[in-house]
Amino acid sequence: MEQYNITGMSCAACSARVEKAVSKVPGVTSCSVSLLTNSMGVEGTASSHDIITAVQQAGYGASLKGSNKEQVSMSEAEEALEDHETPALKRRLIASTGFLIVLMYFSMGHMMWGWPLPAWFNDNHVAMGLVQLLLAGIIMVINQKFFISGFKSLWHRSPNMDTLVALGSMASFVWSVYALFAMTRAQVDGDSAAVMNYMMEFYFESAAMILTLITVGKMLEARSKGKTTDALKSLMKLAPKTAVILRNGQETTVPIEQVKKGDVFVVRPGENIPVDGVIIEGTSAINESALTGESIPVDKAAGDLVSAATVNQSGFIKCEATRVGEDTTLSQIIKMVSDAAATKAPIAKIADRVSGIFVPAVITIAVITTIIWLLTGHEFGYALARGISVLVISCPCALGLATPVAIMVGNGMGAKNGILFKTAVSLEEAGKVQIVALDKTGTITSGQPEVTDLLPADGISETELLTMAFALEKKSEHPLAKAILEHAENLHLTAPEVSDFHALPGNGLSAVLNNETLIGGSMKFISNRVSVPAALSRKAEELAEQGKTPLLFARNGKLVGIIAVADVIKEDSPQAIKELQNMGIRVVMLTGDNERTARAIGAQAGVDDVIAGVLPDGKESVIRSLKEQGKVAMVGDGINDAPALTRADIGIAIGAGTDIAIDAADVVLMKSRLSDVPAAIRLSRATLKNIHENLFWAFFYNTIGIPLAAGVWIPIFGWTLNPMFGAAAMSLSSFCVVTNALRLNLFKIHDAGKDKKIKQATSIEVKNDYNIKEKEQKTMVKVTVNVEGMMCGHCEAHVNEAVKKAFGAEDVVSSHENNTTVFTAPEKVDEDKIRATIKEAGYEVTGITQE
């Protein structure tokens, strides 16, 4: 998407006009204009020259963002968002108010309340009129922008809010000038009655008051709109301006734009990390709250990644730059927030269509109103006042701002809490989700095996069991071994050196320690070599039913104990799932694990449905099936989740994830917390509710205000509306809409107390993708391989990947509990190749059947 700066827009009708003009350019596939940020996003093959020309022909200015430099600095981008409008409006308002007070003194103070005037004004009605003409003229010159913009838009046949203001004010002024000249004629003729009558036809104060009140509203609106971009501006302010890099062994401070990939930079305690990088020397605690919203510092050491704008709280670190400029995490976040602001939510299209015809319709109504009152026998001044009231009370901005201000504030709220909506569409649609599909590994669980249980045999301590396992597993490369090593190291245990280490077929290890033979492995492996007490055997079975992998250890033929390892559920996962269910959302867990393990983990997490045996390539088809039953959000963090994230109605990438997952997602959660999923949906619902409130107010205001201004209720109730009060109402309408949107800043996205409890959907029925294919492919050869050595889901995934790569099979299903790998092939497969493939993956084949 190419971004453009747009100048000259003043209301929703302007943005609608620009969008319509650019959409007609050949090669443009989509265009969205943001009145809040005065920007435009365009997709397609059209040249920037054609696009800019189209904008200019519509009566506005345009320039391609970053066209003058290869890279726009963060300070320049920040400057572009600065509120330059409010100070200018404030100066205009102060000057206008000063002259308006004097004008009101002359026009109403003397006549209504008898306030004193200089003697030369006594009975000098022409002088009174000339003073009012002069003062009103000065105020019109001060607020000339309304007239320039309004009549320019009218000339281009795209009238906007400024056109309504300019027409209303100018009509009052022109009629008053006519009345002044007519009064001078009457005074020359000595017709004092006519003179007094024409004095009552002066609307100079209305012409000036309309402009002043609209300026008040514009200033309040600009101030409020400025606050809607606070989140984006605060993100930009986080970007460091300089970096300290090492060149020839010397520290040199350079502008951030000069840092290149591969440069080595240093960061002292209290300083911000300038760019994304990897620590090559030193340790520290890094405060990443700027990016993730998480206030607790994260310990970092050599080899760990650091991100721009995070704060080094302790320790001197030396880092190598890996991402600079627009590639840093901070820059990508800012780009996502900016792009979201430049897109339009589907609900905004209603307001856009209305805004496009609103101003011409209002002008037509004003003309008809004036004519009708003239035809009913009223004086021209009275009829004109009704028409002017219609012009100045009508507010297209209230309609046009209803959606974008809420989207901008909601998006900013999300960004402050580490929740990034990539488009306005994703912010609107996330709240409509009915089914949430969660990838198990890395989403519900931590993604890394951990030690969960230590069960020593009689007479053996936990420390003794863990030390022995530590010594035995230290030389193993298995993922489960790493879990035991990490647990032991966290307890500051020391592993004695073993000799004669062997990885044995059938899920086992052996070694010698102090002339004692140590063995470890699966239940099946150990039970074939030593006697396992019935109590421990039952306990191992219970652990397996809970989705854990029991590892047994023996010394000199006697069982020492059991260590259970599992990919544990994240601390906040059950609560997050419960919150989703309370919101009326059905939660489904997708996993490649076998049915038994999947059911155990699903029960612990509290999900509604479990779909087991789902291959990486099968997630997309499962999502397609779920979409037939409701609007689906897919939550994942890996490369193999990308197709499913794309297929879902809303794709949510959780945690740091991968670049591919982030690219495929609609919503990016910076933290690895599942609780941010209900928070994102909650924020979406609150934003959508706010939009509905804004649209209701905007339509209600115009529906009630225009008939009142036109005088519809005069024959019934005698209600009339002075043009000045109409202008005041117009000023406040947009302000009310923007202020209502700003209430979202007070919304607590993690507060589940006010969640609307919707009746849950009916049970979800999704057939296992493998079973579907098995039925469809009865003519295929089913290959069942007996495999020794698989101990967990990680082993299964390893074997699946090896078989898939070697034979092109798409439906490989492995089970470490059954020690089998099953897949289908169009014809019988070379069994020697199967054995070689499995052996190369680190496992042994004990049998093959093909049928």
PLM ranges: what are they?
Residues 1-127, 250-253, 331, 335-343, ...:
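Flexible metal-binding regulatory segments at protein termini and peripheral loops
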Residues 88-242, 353, 454, 718-723, ...:
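Transmembrane helix-loop-helix hairpins at the membrane interface
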